[in-house]
Amino acid sequence: MKPFKLIFISALMILIMTNATPISHLNAQANEENKKLKYEKNSALALNYHRVRKKDPLNDFISLLSGSKEIKNYSVTDQEFKSQIQWLKAHDAKFLTLKEFIKYKEKGKFPKRSVWINFDDMDQTIYDNAFPVLKKYHIPATGFLITNHIGSTNFHNLNLLSKKQLDEMYETGLWDFESHTHDLHALKKGNKSKFLDSSQSVASKDIKKSEHYLNKNYPKNERALAYPYGLINDDKIKAMKKNGIQYGFTLQEKAVTPDADNYRIPRILVSNDAFETLIKEWDGFDEEK
């Protein structure tokens, strides 16, 4: 009886924490039912992940009990992630670095079945469960870092990766790191994004600090920013342009075409449901080689 009580209490505690201050559940994509992904011949998929959690009975129980969007829409299990990568490889996906993704976009022509893998926040689950899979298959990826919180052990209930762990990933040559703001990834009262609600002056200072950190520590930086919660407005785009940021990424269920606005480049938030109903059904994987 005692082990069951311990599991139940632990589940309730995690459930409360998960629903209390979720880091990533405001964007419109998470609130819509999955639809068929529109296909255009000259396009690429930007696949975004947040958590790659270990599959175990407790996590499954919490997911079932809570119906939490943080778990359902922002997480895949390690088994699901590995299966998704294997499926993409089996269907001849051309995995791109961010540098290659930008190069093809600017040239106006993506290779067939182009896929760019990227992660927001970079918490411990990415190091534990995604990094080994990508390393095994030699697949490049981009991590968007909240640069003032590298190594934070309780950032909105997340354990973010340490610099030592990020350095290890970077040194493989498979990873590049970009900005997810320096210290503006949070929600204010009324579920307002701290980044969007900040003044241009505050946003500019934050961007400069984040870029300074990245240029100093991970100089393959492409001067890109993934928006907290996938949300952006024209005012913040002005601040980005003033401070040399050339590319900005949202969260939308759309493939990327060369003519996409460089400050509103869509990324598909990957859950297992989204992968099954959107990615596997995308007509781009049926193109002749």
Curated annotation (Swiss-Prot):
Any idea what a deletion of this gene does?
Deletion of icaB leads to shedding of the PIA polymer from the cell surface to the culture filtrate, and an inability to support biofilm formation. Deacetylated PIA is not observed in the mutant strains. Furthermore, these strains are unable to form biofilms, show significantly higher sensitivity to the effects of antibacterial peptides, their adhesion to epithelial cells is significantly lower than that of the wild-type, their phagocytosis by human neutrophils is highly increased, and their persistence is significantly impaired in a murine model of device-related infection.
Q: Name one Pfam family in it.
A: Polysacc_deac_1
User: Which SUPFAM superfamilies is this protein grouped with?
Assistant: Glycoside hydrolase/deacetylase (SSF88713)
A biological process from GO: carbohydrate metabolic process
- All copies of the NodB homology domain together span 113-289
| Effect of substituting K236R | In strain: 97-337
The entry lists its GO molecular-function terms as: hydrolase activity, acting on carbon-nitrogen (but not peptide) bonds, in linear amides
Q: List the disulfide bonds.
A: none
What EC number(s) does this enzyme carry? 3.5.1.-
* Enzyme's top EC category: hydrolase
For the keyword Hydrolase, the answer is yes
Main localisation, per the record? secreted
State its location(s): Secreted, Cell wall
Instruction: Enumerate the InterPro entries for this protein.
Output: Glyco_hydro/deAcase_b/a-brl, NODB_dom, PNAG_deacetylase, Polysacch_Deacetylase
Per the record, the domain of life is Bacteria
According to the UniProt entry, the coiled-coil residues are none
PROSITE patterns in the cross-refs:
NODB (PS51677)
List UniProt keywords, sorted A-Z.
Cell wall, Hydrolase, Secreted, Signal, Virulence
Signal peptide segment: 1-30
What's a GO cellular component annotated to this UniProt protein?
extracellular region
- Which PANTHER family does this chain map to? POLY-BETA-1,6-N-ACETYL-D-GLUCOSAMINE N-DEACETYLASE, PTHR34216
Q: Which family does it belong to?
A: Belongs to the polysaccharide deacetylase family.
Annotated function = Catalyzes the N-deacetylation of poly-beta-1,6-N-acetyl-D-glucosamine (PNAG, also referred to as PIA), a biofilm adhesin polysaccharide. In fact, the IcaB deacetylase converts 15 to 20% of the GlcNAc residues of PNAG to glucosamine. N-deacetylation is crucial for attachment of the polysaccharide to the bacterial cell surface; it leads to the introduction of positive charges in the otherwise neutral PIA polymer, allowing electrostatic interactions.
> Can you say what this protein is called?
Poly-beta-1,6-N-acetyl-D-glucosamine N-deacetylase
From what organism does this protein derive?
Staphylococcus epidermidis
Top-level taxonomy: Bacteria, Bacillati, Bacillota, Bacilli, Bacillales
